[in-house]
Design a protein with these regions (language model features):
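His/Glu-based metal-binding/catalytic segments typifying zinc-dependent metallopeptidases
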Residues: 1-34
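Buried hydrophobic packing residues in well-ordered domains
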Residues: 5, 21-23, 39, 64, ...
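Short beta-strand-to-loop capping motifs
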Residues: 7-9, 66-68, 168-169
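Short beta-strands and strand-coil junctions in structured, solvent-facing domains, enriched
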Residues: 11-14, 71-72, 87, 173
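M16/MPP (pitrilysin/insulinase) zinc-metallopeptidase core fold and M16-derived inactive scaffolds
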Residues: 26-45, 56, 87
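M16/insulysin-pitrilysin zinc metalloprotease superfamily fold
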Residues: 50, 54-111, 179-185
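C-terminal regions of mature proteins
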Residues: 86, 104-185
Length: 185
């Protein structure tokens, strides 16, 4: 079963986009992330799980995706919501620091590819009408605090899922309304 939760997030001009990206990275940006460790490694509820934050001109979206079995979809969905709620109170400074390092490493490593560099320059020019320096971007990433990420996590929990998509045999999956109720509790 393919499972996706999506939440409205900041647009690309909103300074909170860096907070959203750090939140998504800490929650599901790799093997050391909270969702990967708790849901995949500790509980074995899925074979893949990740989170990401995307931004557009007038809105943004933070999504969580997991691939699981029909037998595990209900438990996976509920534990995902529980981890989102927990992040609002116990996202650690170490998790945020690790996410910051991961984002900066990705940014710097992306500069090694001419096509990535060209795409970055074009994207930044179209968004900002200028090209912010790497140092400016790194400073924005470094300025995001653990408190900022916890506040963003609380905001996500308080605005219970905008959308859910399921593909596959998911008859035992909780409804979006059930997940919203669990998130708001």
């Amino acid at each position: 079963v393919h499972f996706t939760l999506a939440f409205e997030g900041p647009n690309y001009r909103d300074p909170d986009i860096y907070t959203a990206q750090i939140y998504a990275t800490a929650m599901g940006g790799g093997m050391s992330s909270r969702l990967f460790q708790e849901i995949r490694e500790n509980r074995g509820l899925c074979y893949t799980i990740f989170a990401q934050a995307g931004a557009y001109e007038d809105t943004g979206m933070t999504t969580i995706y997991a691939g699981t079995s029909a037998e595990e979809i209900e438990n996976l969905a509920n534990v995902t919501i529980d981890e989102m709620k927990r992040a609002a109170s116990d996202m650690s400074a170490a998790e945020v620091a690790r996410a910051r390092v991961q984002m900066k490493a990705g940014l710097l490593m992306g500069l090694e590819s001419p096509s990535n560099r060209a795409e970055r320059l074009a994207r930044l020019l179209s968004i900002w009408d200028r090209i912010p320096s790497i140092e400016e971007t790194i400073k924005r990433i470094d300025n995001v605090t653990t408190g900022d990420v916890r506040e963003f996590a609380a905001h996500m929990a308080g605005h219970a899922g905008s959308a859910m998509a399921l593909y596959g045999p998911a008859s035992s999956a909780p409804s979006l309304d059930d997940l919203r109720t669990r998130l708001a509790a």
